[in-house]
Amino acid sequence: THSDLPMTIAFDGRMWMMGGWYNGRLPGHSASNQVWCSTDGANWRQAMPNAEWSPRLASALVEFQGKMWLLGGTENYYFGDASSVKNDVWCSGDGVHWECVTNSAGWAPRAYHQAAVLDGKLYVFGGGNYVPDYVALNDVWVSEDGREWTCLTDAAPWHPRLWFSAAVYRDRMWVLGGWSNNPSTNWADVWYSKDGKTWTQLKSNLIWRERHEHSVFVYEDKLWVAGGMIPPLNNEVWSL
């Protein structure tokens, strides 16, 4: 039921879904720390009713060093404050037993961000907070162990943003689309980097329309963009 901004990943032959928000701004809203998995997408098993990390949504979730790594997020979508946003780092090899690698990583607390793994290193970039105070970031951080972090840049050339998507494709990290405020703006730009410091914009005469909260994935050596909020909600599928 906590299907708004949960964390998802394919890991160890299973699809995983964890955390997320329920019921929007309506009574009974809540965040989750449930962990679910499935081998076929139709039949789901609850691996954990309450993981060790606090209920949250909009964390980053990646595979690193043979484990799932969960980074940051927010404990409250619409009704929180600055303390709701997290910068803790957790890892698990089975979705059941979670280890807190650090309660306070070097990067500022954030949600709606992304993480990536490239050349044996773990990267965190962008994101921030939506309400009550809008914060958007375009910094890039790197770690070799998830505990000690180094800032590669305080300001990447792409605009600070929330609700963007990222992937690792052809030995590069990619940042695609997203949203920023003041004024409210959806993005349709595409950036890539091999090291997190130097970013290059990929420009194309034919590209998908500006959007946020879209899906990005790699399949058959192509980079795919699916869905997203333009508005309205969209069901286009594009590939590069």
Regions found by a protein language model. Give the residues of each.
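Kelch-like beta-propeller repeat domains
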Residues: 1-240
